[in-house]
Amino acid sequence: MPVVDVDPDELRYLTGHSEKDDDELKSDLFNLGLEFEGWTEDDEFQLEFAPDRLDRLSVEGVARSLRYHYGDDRGVEIPNTNSADWTIEVEDQPDERPYVTGAIVRGLDMDEAALESLIQLQEKLHATMGRKRAKGAIGVHDLTMLKGDSVTDETGKSITYTSADPDEATFVPLDADAEMTPSEVMASHETGQTYGDLVADFDRVPAIYDAIGLFSFPPVINGRRTEVSVDSRDLFIEMTGTNQWTIDHMCNIVCYALAARGGQVEKVDVSYADDAPGEYAGKTLERPDFSVRTKTVTHDRIESILGVSLDSREVVDYAERAGLDATETESDDGVAYDVEVPPYRVDVIHPLDIIDDIGRALGFNSLEPTYPDVSTVGGRHERSRLEDAARDALVGLGFEDLLNFHMTNEVENFERMNLSTPEAEDGNDADTVGLADPVTIQEPYSEDYTILRTWALPSIMMVLENNTHRSYPQDLAEIGLAAGLDDSENTGVAEHRTVAAALARTDASYEDAKARLQALADAFDKDLETPPTTHPSFIGGRAAEVVLDGESVGVIGEIHPKVLVEHDLELPVAAFEFRLDALA
């Protein structure tokens, strides 16, 4: 869970509620879902909160939530923006990091507390949305130290996001006194050593230039020339990454935080060259993008989830107190609400998120629990007992137990496993393990999580990929959820628990995996047969069906070299996967 350090005096200042003592603030924060974890050495609150509320990674974001809670603010608030007449020209940027966004914020009251909060927000966003800067990285610069390439009335000022030769480009990085090349930064600068691996394999590294020269080497480090201090009043914000949506929303969160400090947000144009990689080639984007999103939720569903009766005026009122705007409308299911979501709320992806906000505005403490009329006696489900027994057996066979995400994406689930996606219909057998039609996420929060996995072996392969620096052998197993579309099910989705295991070692073979599988079958008194089969993820002639008590339930074999190469594995891997219920 994310933890943010917040000065209670700053909360009182930013909310305008100087009368609130520390205990009152803690109670109010708890009602918002922020739990007090303790004090820092600087007498600040340590607050833990749900990882989806990334807009609360700063004291400004926490204060905004409190102002809504107190009723001082209502509904969606959009900062007033002007055009800054600045353009980010995007040309010859690295294909591996093709996207950029930005904004200008003027007139800030930048004291020490504000600067510390900005730095904390920057690093927290790097660690969360930015995936340790791999997916998105933020650069904040003193605007007065930049010089645009053009100062004509027609075109305004511009800077350039491009690529540079890591051994030729030079600049003075932060915390340094002499010019260095990007290669030297990655080799000898402390920050460069930490984040240089993100671009070390690039032929040309990301670089941002103004008329003076290189001033940012994203995602590694900024230049000293544009360093921000407490004397800075006007800031230029740039963000680069592998996904435009991610960096745009990171930018929104930062801009809202700075606007809370009195900053005036100004828009910049992001102009992509005609030959730029990605879907924005030849396009000019106006950023930051403060467009609101609209979600629809029905009145019946709100009452059903919260367990209370509300009239329409109350729903609209609670939505506004949660920082949303709700308009009553009609749907096929009766009264509904079109709810506008502010641009910093990246967590709202489903009507249930709206209902959760309404419930918090109502006050979950005000909800009265009701007891069921029927008395029941609880007990463990047989499936749970079976799962624990299978897990104990796998551990006894020398496997390390894993717990992976059930959500993944089509590239990991299919392509990197040498499987074509089901819609490709290129001859893959419909009964191939892992080849079910996937359950897709309608509005995915991240491109990494767009489907429910159809099998667990790809998850294990990703763990092996991320642990090539560890010693071998690595024998890993997981019992977890897999799912696929199935019209015969009432929900249209068939879910099952699956058992997957892999042996990564110098002598890994089909025979090794078969011996472990046989021992597992014997432990559950199951008759095991392994007739030969073919599967794209396994080597031809070294794969077989897993047949337990006469029913085909899985596959076993040696992983195909293509799959090993995709996962940067240099040792052979033998693996199996089958349905857990076959052990019942």
UniProtKB/Swiss-Prot annotation:
Gene Ontology terms, MF aspect: ATP binding; magnesium ion binding; phenylalanine-tRNA ligase activity; RNA binding
A Pfam family recorded for this sequence: tRNA_synthFbeta
InterPro entries: aa-tRNA-synth_II/BPL/LPL, B3/B4_tRNA-bd, DNA-bd_dom_put_sf, Phe-tRNA-ligase_IIc_bsu, Phe-tRNA-synth_IIc_bsu_arc_euk, Phe-tRNA_synthase-like_B3/B4, Phe_tRNA_ligase_beta2_arc, PheRS_beta_core
Keyword annotations from UniProtKB, A to Z: Aminoacyl-tRNA synthetase, ATP-binding, Cytoplasm, Ligase, Magnesium, Metal-binding, Nucleotide-binding, Protein biosynthesis
Reaction(s) catalysed (UniProt annotation): tRNA(Phe) + L-phenylalanine + ATP = L-phenylalanyl-tRNA(Phe) + AMP + diphosphate + H(+)
Residue numbers binding Mg(2+): D347, D353, D356, D357
Domain B5: 290-369
Record's subcellular location: Cytoplasm
Gene3D superfamilies for the chain: 3.30.56.10, Bira Bifunctional Protein, Domain 2 (3.30.930.10), Phenylalanyl-trna Synthetase, Chain B, domain 3 (3.50.40.10)
GO cellular component assignments: phenylalanine-tRNA ligase complex
Cofactor(s) required for function per UniProt: Mg(2+)
GO biological process: phenylalanyl-tRNA aminoacylation
EC identifiers of the protein: 6.1.1.20
Family the UniProt entry places it in: Belongs to the phenylalanyl-tRNA synthetase beta subunit family. Type 2 subfamily.
Complex and partners: Tetramer of two alpha and two beta subunits.
Name of the protein: Phenylalanine--tRNA ligase beta subunit
Organism: Haloarcula marismortui (strain ATCC 43049 / DSM 3752 / JCM 8966 / VKM B-1809)
